[in-house]
């Protein structure tokens, strides 16, 4: 392969000059620079400047680089390890292990991170629901197999626990694999996530890729592609259903904006890169269902200053099939998962896709909860006595529904002391249908909280009654 020399270094941007009689590296090719301390720095070609000079973006710090250092053209884009050996491991953007585990040798299976989206002929055009076993999601904001879901929520509302439960349920219910990609978030959070997943027993079915906020923009921009490439192997070669978590998709855009400015491109709206829609599309179009398997992506979305018209979240929304909104108000009254049943949405919630019964039950649940929401002001000011009998019934059922939307999680059982429950979709629909019909109006509201299927509610109510009878007989 051809070799050149470092011409200039401007932060994470490295210009490299190649002899005019040698073949220039192509855009997205990886270059290797041997540093004086023996380490190798990888850069990626971003621009050709002419006269044998290319402008590259470094995937690590450029401290210690000097003009004239030798640069080797690898003749290919960055490639990362794939396959079963990646499970339970933590990687950086280059696919190098960062968990103090064994390194991957030259014989390890690898795939380039820059790949085309699947061809139209290879896509699975049937819309299938991906059952998660989590009642509130399956009923009100169902996930599509091969779809993209936006996860919204502030700090401490249970995003991580929900992500872990999804990983657990996909592994148990679908024998699926998960890939967690940390893009531009805090190193401490990545570290905590690793140990929490280890403790909850889901790590061996998960590959983790991190490009944290202290890393150069090149690494943060490409780390999502590294995680996606690992997921694509399990979909295309192993024929599996894969969950791909990206936390946070906004940081992917932010890193692209930094790189764009470093390359001297004229910024677009609000200072973002002019190639924003293209970069987002190249990533999102690779996340899909094929005839072999599927990649379903759950992406945490940070909304700058809560402005949903900002180009970064607005470009992301164009690709989403569903949104799962976590609400702090629900955590304060002990409803976990704290998914807002009225704010969460899904394009799949139509009778043609989920079926007539599911659609009708879901819309009735939303109607009852919306009516309860409207009546809360009256209740807080005037009290329950001012409501009509019909309104009192709606409030009573809405409270039971709200409690029944909560659920005990397997990954949280060590903290709650309650066994986790995977609830099949049929059971979920049956339970809510019977609550709406008034079948359980006589059971206490508390019996509906943090349980699995409706049978658990009946069982819990019996226990509560037995305990009450026991206490009264002792008195």
Curated annotation (Swiss-Prot):
Protein EC: 7.1.2.2
Reaction catalysis annotation: ATP + H2O + 4 H(+)(in) = ADP + phosphate + 5 H(+)(out)
UniProt subunit comment: F-type ATPases have 2 components, CF(1) - the catalytic core - and CF(0) - the membrane proton channel. CF(1) has five subunits: alpha(3), beta(3), gamma(1), delta(1), epsilon(1). CF(0) has three main subunits: a(1), b(2) and c(9-12). The alpha and beta chains form an alternating ring which encloses part of the gamma chain. CF(1) is attached to CF(0) by a central stalk formed by the gamma and epsilon chains, while a peripheral stalk is formed by the delta and b chains.
Name of the protein: ATP synthase subunit beta
Compartments, as annotated in UniProt: Cell membrane
GO molecular function, one term: proton-transporting ATP synthase activity, rotational mechanism
Species of provenance: Limosilactobacillus reuteri (strain DSM 20016) (Lactobacillus reuteri)
Function: Produces ATP from ADP in the presence of a proton gradient across the membrane. The catalytic sites are hosted primarily by the beta subunits.
Residues holding ATP: 153-160
Pfam families, sorted: ATP-synt_ab, ATP-synt_ab_N, ATP-synt_VA_C
């Amino acid at each position: 392969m051809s070799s050149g020399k470092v011409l200039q270094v401007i932060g994470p941007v490295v210009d490299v000059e190649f002899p005019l009689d040698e073949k220039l590296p192509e855009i997205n090719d990886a270059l290797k620079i041997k540093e004086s301390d023996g380490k190798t720095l990888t850069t990626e070609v971003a621009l050709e400047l002419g006269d044998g000079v290319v402008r590259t973006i470094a995937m690590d710090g450029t401290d210690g680089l000097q003009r004239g250092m030798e640069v080797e053209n690898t003749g290919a884009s960055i490639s990362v390890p794939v396959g079963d050996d990646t499970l339970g491991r933590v990687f950086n953007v280059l696919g190098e292990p960062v968990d103090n585990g064994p390194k991957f040798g030259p014989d390890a299976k690898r795939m380039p991170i820059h790949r085309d989206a699947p061809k139209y002929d290879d896509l699975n055009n049937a819309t299938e629901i991906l059952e998660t076993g989590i009642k509130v999601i399956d009923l009100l904001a169902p996930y599509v197999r091969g779809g993209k879901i936006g996860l919204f929520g502030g700090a401490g509302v249970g995003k991580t626990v929900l992500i872990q439960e999804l990983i657990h349920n996909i592994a148990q219910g679908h024998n699926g694999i998960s890939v967690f990609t940390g893009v531009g978030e805090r190193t401490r959070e990545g570290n905590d996530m690793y140990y929490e997943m280890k403790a909850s027993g889901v790590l061996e079915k998960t590959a983790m890729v991190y490009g944290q906020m202290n890393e150069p923009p090149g690494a943060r921009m490409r780390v999502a592609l590294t995680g996606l490439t690992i997921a694509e192997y399990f979909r295309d070669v192993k024929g599996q259903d894969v969950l791909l978590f990206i936390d946070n998709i906004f940081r992917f855009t932010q890193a692209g904006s930094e790189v764009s400015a470093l390359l001297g491109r004229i910024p677009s709206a609000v200072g973002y890169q002019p190639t924003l829609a293209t970069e987002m599309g190249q990533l999102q179009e690779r996340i899909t269902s094929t005839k072999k398997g599927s990649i379903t992506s759950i992406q945490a979305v940070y909304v700058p200053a809560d402005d949903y018209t900002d180009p970064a979240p607005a470009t992301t929304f164009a690709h989403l099939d569903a949104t799962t909104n976590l609400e702090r108000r629900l955590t304060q009254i002990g409803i976990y998962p704290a998914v807002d049943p009225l704010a969460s949405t899904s394009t799949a919630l139509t009778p043609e896709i989920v079926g007539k019964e599911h659609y009708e039950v879901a819309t009735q649940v939303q109607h009852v909860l919306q009516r309860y929401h409207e009546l809360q002001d009256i209740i807080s000011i005037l009290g329950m006595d001012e409501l009509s009998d019909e309104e009192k019934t709606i409030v009573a059922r809405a409270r039971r529904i709200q409690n029944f939307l909560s659920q005990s999680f397997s990954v949280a059982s060590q903290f709650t002391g309650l066994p986790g429950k995977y609830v099949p979709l049929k059971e979920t629909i049956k339970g809510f249908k019977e609550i709406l019909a008034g079948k359980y109006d006589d059971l206490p509201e508390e019996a509906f909280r943090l349980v699995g299927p409706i049978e658990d509610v009946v069982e819990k109510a019996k226990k509560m009654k037995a305990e009450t009878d026991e206490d009264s007989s002792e008195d």
